[in-house]
Amino acid sequence: MDIDNFKSVNDTLGHAGGDEALKLLADTMRLVFGTHVLMARFGGDEFVLCIQNRDQEGVQAQLDKLVRSMCQTFTYGGCSVPLSISLGAVYMTEKFPYEKLFKEADSVLYEVKTRGKNSFEIWKI
């Protein structure tokens, strides 16, 4: 998952504003998922969510809520920018190495961003 057009957020609001946008995302993820998910910043504006033992429909509803919650105008220091996220997810039916999961999730994320961002998609592997 990453913040759409994060470079323009940083360019407009400065790095302190970008940091606040990242904090908003982390806080929103906590509200949506609670303690039932492992969340980690993967680098820059990219995050990884690891959700175990959940039904696909429930996860889909939570991801939809997260994407909708993050689609907003974000204001920092008197300046405002549009904010949204794109998310690629994989739903595994058997065990895979983490490297494969990350690679597949990154491929899904690329597809979402190619189609226009501010969305999510889940691939079953």
Regions found by a protein language model. Name each.
Residues 1:
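Active-site flanking residues adjacent to catalytic metal/cofactor-binding acidic residues
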Residues 41, 70-86, 113:
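Catalytic core regions of nucleotide second-messenger enzymes
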Residues 50-52, 90:
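Short hydrophobic/aromatic beta-strand micro-patches
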Residues 60, 64, 77, 91-121:
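Catalytic-core segments of nucleotide cyclases and related cyclic-nucleotide turnover enzymes
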Residues 41, 89, 121-124:
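Structural signal for conserved beta-strand scaffold positions within catalytic alpha/beta enzyme cores
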Residues 4-34, 40-44, 48-49, 56-64, ...:
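Conserved long alpha-helical elements within nucleotide-processing catalytic cores of c-di-GMP signaling
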Residues 11, 52, 113-114, 125:
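Short, conserved catalytic or interaction motifs in soluble domains
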